[in-house]
Curated annotation (Swiss-Prot):
Occurs in many kinds of cells as a complex with monomeric actin in a 1:1 ratio. The modification Phosphothreonine is found at residue 114. Binds to actin and affects the structure of the cytoskeleton. At high concentrations, profilin prevents the polymerization of actin, whereas it enhances it at low concentrations. By binding to PIP2, it inhibits the formation of IP3 and DG. Disulfide bonds join 13-118. One of its GO terms (molecular function) is actin monomer binding. Phosphorylated by MAP kinases. SUPFAM superfamilies: Profilin (actin-binding protein) (SSF55770). This is Profilin-2. The variability of the residues taking part of IgE-binding epitopes might be responsible of the difference in cross-reactivity among olive pollen cultivars, and between distantly related pollen species, leading to a variable range of allergy reactions among atopic patients.
Length: 134
């Protein structure tokens, strides 16, 4: 399966039990910041934004004072899982980032999608990739 198929079929799909509700944007990005696959709506990010995200995975709490920035959008960092998941909130939407052995799985959402639904979609794919050694 291509990386684009993972984004299209496993991240940008309808939320289980909520037909028509889906993430706003999604991507799979290597630890080095190279985009493996992304939705057409995924924001163009700066290398320093990706560096900040990677630093927060290695040093949990790094982004808390400044917020998480992606594509020029600032998210307030909320409770995640140290070294494994970063979550951010902005207005009625937010972001979930799951770290795997080689990649970061991104999901961005707006209402009516809930934070929990975004977490479920992103973390399920991230956990699968981890099980596959990726």
């Amino acid at each position: 399966m291509s990386w684009q198929a993972y984004v299209d079929d496993h991240l940008m799909c309808d939320i289980e039990g909520h037909e028509g509700h889906r993430l706003t944007a999604a991507a799979i990005v290597g630890h080095d910041g190279s985009v493996w696959a992304q939705s057409a709506t995924f924001p163009q990010f700066k290398p320093e934004e990706m560096n900040g995200i990677m630093t927060d995975f290695n040093e949990p709490g790094h982004l808390a004072p400044t917020g998480l920035h992606l594509g020029g959008t600032k998210y307030m960092v909320i409770q995640g899982e140290a070294g494994a998941v970063i979550r951010g909130k902005k207005g009625s939407g937010g972001i979930t980032i799951k770290k795997t052995g080689q990649a970061l799985v991104f999901g961005i959402y707006e209402e009516p999608v809930t934070p929990g639904q975004c977490n479920m979609v992103v973390e399920r794919l991230g956990d699968y990739l981890l099980e596959q050694g990726l």
